[in-house]
Amino acid sequence: MRRRRAGGRTMVERASKFVLVVAGSACFMLILYQYAGPGLSLGAPGGRVPPDDLDLFPTPDPHYEKKYYFPVRELERSLRFDMKGDDVIVFLHIQKTGGTTFGRHLVQNVRLEVPCDCRPGQKKCTCYRPNRRETWLFSRFSTGWSCGLHADWTELTNCVPGVLDRRDPAGLRSPRKFYYITLLRDPVSRYLSEWRHVQRGATWKTSLHMCDGRTPTPEELPPCYEGTDWSGCTLQEFMDCPYNLANNRQVRMLADLSLVGCYNLSFIPESKRAQLLLESAKKNLRGMAFFGLTEFQRKTQYLFERTFNLKFIRPFMQYNSTRAGGVEVDEDTIRHIEELNDLDMQLYDYAKDLFQQRYQYKRQLERREQRLRNREERLLHRSKEALPREDPEEPGRVPTEDYMSHIIEKW
């Protein structure tokens, strides 16, 4: 009787110990996962998630309604950018669109075989190709304002080839291929930001505005102020100047100004001039290798990376600010700014739709390709499992015992 009781107690103790071991193991695994789980992937080598699997980018809106029709060729935008060849990225920097931040990303934040050499105290970085001492990037922070301060499309397309030929003589090699890129911004936000910048003393008066081989005359481009700058100007004064280049700046800087007689307003009627500028800006925007939107930083990063097959080291940050840039602006004033920038409003509406459609197209294409890869992997796995196995039994192999009985006996 005592032996039975002793045996019963022993079995109970063994079972209790087993339960404690299992519970302790579960708690340990839970704690381990809490600390290490976010960075672990059971299927990834070394337990780390590959950078490409970290989805930093927003999910496309499935209910997005397209406003304009764009053929697939306008949405694909996948280039074979050859950094070791003769390809050059040209950044058209429009004032107050976030171009300074993006320009720094290009020289400091792109994962490159040979990173740009950016030294403290110097305004420009050296961005050489991996195989020779030639620049692959034409921008403010790499080549400086070589075609003039904030050069526009008309200036850059006529100036960049000559500047690079003087810097890096082409010799007998094939001609360079230029990939133009830019950023756009909501016109009201951009306009208010430019006013605040001018109010603090900015002028951009050293800009050349070169067109058809000459700069505009004072009669073609009168100043909005007298003196060295326009610091302290009110928003009303800023809006009242009919010659203010802030009005429809994005359209003007993206259009081919030669089509409208440059800055000669008497060349063609105003209504026709406006329509030609808008259509030219749209055409040139479509023809660019890439453009981003200030209001969509992560999507801008995504499209740039997929277009040029280049990766940024750190993700872009979205800094949301008010339209008025910290200044109270009533609805009537906003409507007036929209009227002054009617061409920019139309261009931005067009650009935003093209941008969103490109993003959706790229994401859908990637998901489709991922599903195909997963399907191929499953089929390959099944085909391997279906192969006949002819492995002979190992001599002297003992049949596996019941796991629970084995653990209890060990205790």
UniProtKB/Swiss-Prot annotation:
One of its GO terms (molecular function) is heparan sulfate 6-sulfotransferase activity. Residues 352-386 form a coiled coil. Glycans are attached at residues 264, 320. The keyword Transferase applies. Gene3D superfamilies: P-loop containing nucleotide triphosphate hydrolases. It is a single-pass type II membrane protein. Keywords: Coiled coil, Glycoprotein, Membrane, Signal-anchor, Transferase, Transmembrane, Transmembrane helix. It is found in: Membrane. It comes from the Eukaryota. Residues 38-411 are lumenal. SUPFAM superfamilies: P-loop containing nucleoside triphosphate hydrolases (SSF52540). It holds the Pfam family Sulfotransfer_2. It catalyses: alpha-D-glucosaminyl-[heparan sulfate](n) + 3'-phosphoadenylyl sulfate = 6-sulfo-alpha-D-glucosaminyl-[heparan sulfate](n) + adenosine 3',5'-bisphosphate + H(+). Residues 1-19 are cytoplasmic. N-glycosylated. This is Heparan-sulfate 6-O-sulfotransferase 1.
